[in-house]
Amino acid sequence: MMDVGEPMSQLLGRGIRGCALFVALLVAGPLAAQQVVHVGGAFFPPYVVKAEHSQHAGLLPQLLDALNRAQSDFRFIVRPTSIPRRYQDFEAGRIDMSMFENPAWGWQEIAHSVVDMGLEDAEVFVARAEPGRGQGYFKRLRGKRLALFNGYHYGFADFNAEPQFLAKNFDATLTYSHDSNLLMVLHGRADIALATRSYVSDFLESHRQYAGQLLISRRVDQRYRHQVLLRPAAPISAAQLGRLFEQLRRTGQLAAIFAPYRIAVRSGAADSSVTAGVSD
């Protein structure tokens, strides 16, 4: 019942506050209903750049933006991690998924489900271009100084990423910078570096002064058929995520993001991407 003695200004104030609260609830409702999906951001250029900082760059943020715009049930956000720490973060539930992965990269004993992203890249060998040097230079790695990224799993080493193994069996220098590895090759401090084809393409686009100075192998160390690994308790299921990737592929959004980096978008890959998880 209205208090007849209550000033009109107070009544108006109540009404305004009530309307504001109603509008706020209307706006917040859809956001509150969204389930947050934490995606691990481990340094893997050009996919993830500056993952240890609050501002993320690279292709992963572009992909998550496209996923967020494609639906309203989930909100995908990057949570920083690192190459070695991502396993622990995944098992602890700090991250719900890890993208641009391969189950052979140390995930064999960790429960997960797999979604094929429908994207393909390749790890290639890179040397300094010199007169008379051709593709035969990449046939043998023994006796050559290698510049590798610490923590990465390489095919030529049977995916053994242990620094001691690489140092003992290969003349390998391990760093945390792909730029440094390529510069070591360019300046004669290493004979061969390994990097993704997409990264080498991006490096040469950003450092045009090195055009023609690198010899890139036709030999491929490994082909990346990029996959998403989902933890069992993730807010989104493998089937739901697979349908979202198929939607982005069908509408051309995957190609718009990845094709400029020479990352192939495989036709129809997401239709059959959902597979059973690996158990402990």
Give residue spans per PLM region.
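N-terminal signal peptide c-region/cleavage motif recognized by signal peptidases
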Residues: 28-29
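Extracytoplasmic small-molecule ligand-binding "clamshell" domains
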Residues: 34-110, 174, 251, 260-261, ...
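Periplasmic-binding protein-like
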Residues: 41-45, 120-124, 209-245, 265-279
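Extended ligand-binding regions for polar small-molecule ligands
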Residues: 61-71, 131-132, 138-145, 152, ...
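Ligand-binding cleft/hinge of the Venus flytrap
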Residues: 64-72, 116, 142, 150-175, ...
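Short helices/loops that flank or line small-molecule/ion binding pockets
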Residues: 70, 84-95, 178-199
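Ligand-binding clefts/hinges and TM-proximal coupling segments of bilobed small-molecule sensing domains
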Residues: 74-75, 153-170, 245-280
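Acidic, polar ligand-binding/catalytic clefts
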Residues: 78-141, 153-156, 218-219
